[in-house]
């Protein structure tokens, strides 16, 4: 039996991320009524942006299309903007059924993440102004969740951050009906903080975030496997290996993705590389054995399968089943 993604903790991490972001929602078009008030806030009340060093003093992502949101539809609008930027040609109306929940009158964060994955994009969450400015300066727009109301009367809203200017202490966003809206950093800090400084990157799988961490990137790419976006997940794992060439999880994920793309030669090589990285782990030997058997390399498959059984571990029963299946093939 082929052990699909026998990688400890990755599936758990995906579920945890979705649980964490699944409990909030936005509440529609109040942003339009508040926009005049927001842009009028004092620029001198914060050094929010200037506190971040080692970044350009100003940056702007110029190629993000703008879609004016319809009532209660800021989730589909924001997601459509960044998906189009990433190369996926969709309108907000194409996404509404995927991300908008009528009963909640808004879009959950987990729905945006799931939709991005279904369209072959890596959904990578960030938090904090340092990460936000790093991504903008790298040319990556960021969806942000802000609360335009109060803690006791929240008015959730999604916008897309496009730029910043440290000297002027300003943040530039596509929001509501306003393209390139300018907010003071003090205003942005307060409304974003109420949304727990949550940001979302929607990236092509060959493009790492500026602030990419290995575990977080691999968890995000595993989300593509979860929705069977095999070409995208294969690219995402290969991209990880360009930076973290000794990542066991990336080699295993690459092997799984390539196997599902019916590229047995490349899948076998990926699992072989994983065996070199963790020679005392039965999982890569089990998967390698399965692919070798499909390639008709039965003796090599038996050797690899037996090695997995000998190593044992929590998937020992699966390893035994793989070995028995290969033995039956060799006697047919």
Language-model features: locations:
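Noncatalytic regulatory segments and standalone regulatory/sensor domains
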Residues: 42-47, 166-254
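Cysteine-nucleophile protease catalytic domains, especially the papain-like/related folds used
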Residues: 42-126, 131, 204-207, 223, ...
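Active-site-adjacent substructure of cysteine-protease-like catalytic cores
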Residues: 122, 126-174
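Helix-start (N-cap) detector for alpha-helical repeat units in TPR-like alpha-solenoids
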Residues: 214, 248-249, 282-283, 316-317
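TPR/Sel1-like alpha-solenoid repeat signature
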Residues: 224, 251-258, 270, 284-292, ...
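Structural marker of alpha-solenoid helical repeat scaffolds
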Residues: 243, 277, 311-312
């Amino acid at each position: 039996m082929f052990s699909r993604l026998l990688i400890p903790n990755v599936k758990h991490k995906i579920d945890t991320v979705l649980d964490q972001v699944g409990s909030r929602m936005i509440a529609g078009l109040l942003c339009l009524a508040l926009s005049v008030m927001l842009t009028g806030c004092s620029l001198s009340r914060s050094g929010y942006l200037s506190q971040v060093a080692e970044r350009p003093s100003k940056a702007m992502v110029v190629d993000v299309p703008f879609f004016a949101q319809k009532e209660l539809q800021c989730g589909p609008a924001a997601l459509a903007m960044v998906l189009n930027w990433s190369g996926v040609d969709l309108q907000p109306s194409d996404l509404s059924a995927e991300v908008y929940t009528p009963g909640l009158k808004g879009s959950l964060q987990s729905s945006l993440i799931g939709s991005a994955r279904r369209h072959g994009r890596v959904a990578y969450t960030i938090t904090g102004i340092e990460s936000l400015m790093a991504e903008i300066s790298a040319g990556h727009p960021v969806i942000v969740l802000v609360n335009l109301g109060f803690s006791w009367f929240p008015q959730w809203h999604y916008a897309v951050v496009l730029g910043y200017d440290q000297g002027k202490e300003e943040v530039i966003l596509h929001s509501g009906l306003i393209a390139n809206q300018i907010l003071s950093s003090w205003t942005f800090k307060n409304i974003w903080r109420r949304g727990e400084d949550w940001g979302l990157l929607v990236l092509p799988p060959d493009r790492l975030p500026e602030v990419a961490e290995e575990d977080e990137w691999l968890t995000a790419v595993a989300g593509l496997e979860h929705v069977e976006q095999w070409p995208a997940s294969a690219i995402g794992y290969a991209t990880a290996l360009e930076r973290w060439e000794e990542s066991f999880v990336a080699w295993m994920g690459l092997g799984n993705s390539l196997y599902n793309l019916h590229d047995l030669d490349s899948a076998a090589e990926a699992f072989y590389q994983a065996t070199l990285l963790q020679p005392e782990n039965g999982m890569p030997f089990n998967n390698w054995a399965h692919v070798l058997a499909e390639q008709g390399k039965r003796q090599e498959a038996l050797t690899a399968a037996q090695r997995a059984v000998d190593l044992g571990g929590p998937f020992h029963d699966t390893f035994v089943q793989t070995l028995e299946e290969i033995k039956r093939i060799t006697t047919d």
